[in-house]
Amino acid sequence: MIQPQTYVNVADNSGARKLMCIRVLDASFKQSANIGDTIIAVVKEAIPNMPLKKSDIVRAVIVRSAKGIRRPDGTIIRFDDNAAVVINKEGNPRGTRVFGPVARELREREFTKIVSLAPEVL
């Protein structure tokens, strides 16, 4: 569960290393985001000489969550860290690579480009 002020790792090569969530999108009443939800975040750590700089405001989609989610068959999938992929307004990733595994639920949420770039889908 990602809520405002939560730090998340960045799972792509867009230039950011850490993001801090400042708003959960997709619903006005929602207080927290889970896998597949879109957030607005600020870059807190960045790689030098890359397009994204510290204090840039970006959109990101959550690809891994330590809280985990329950699937319809009863299994629960959870990860070791909270991670996100930086996206543009159209929902396409800003980076060209995705690091680490991502959840299968991203395919149902129409983030097929992120799923195709990921090395492993759980």
UniProtKB/Swiss-Prot annotation:
Function: Binds to 23S rRNA.
CDD domains reported for this sequence: Ribosomal_uL14
Keywords: Chloroplast, Plastid, Ribonucleoprotein, Ribosomal protein, RNA-binding, rRNA-binding
Species this protein is from: Oltmannsiellopsis viridis (Marine flagellate)
Signal sequence range: none
Biological process terms in GO annotation: translation
Subunit (UniProt): Part of the 50S ribosomal subunit.
HAMAP family, sorted: Ribosomal_uL14 (MF_01367)
Major place of residence: plastid
Similarity remark: Belongs to the universal ribosomal protein uL14 family.
SUPFAM superfamilies in alphabetical order: Ribosomal protein L14 (SSF50193)
A single Gene Ontology CC term: chloroplast
UniProt-listed Pfam families: Ribosomal_L14
Subcellular location: Plastid, Chloroplast
Protein name: Large ribosomal subunit protein uL14c
Gene behind this protein: rpl14
InterPro entries for the chain: Ribosomal_uL14, Ribosomal_uL14_bac-type, Ribosomal_uL14_CS, Ribosomal_uL14_sf
GO molecular function: large ribosomal subunit rRNA binding; structural constituent of ribosome
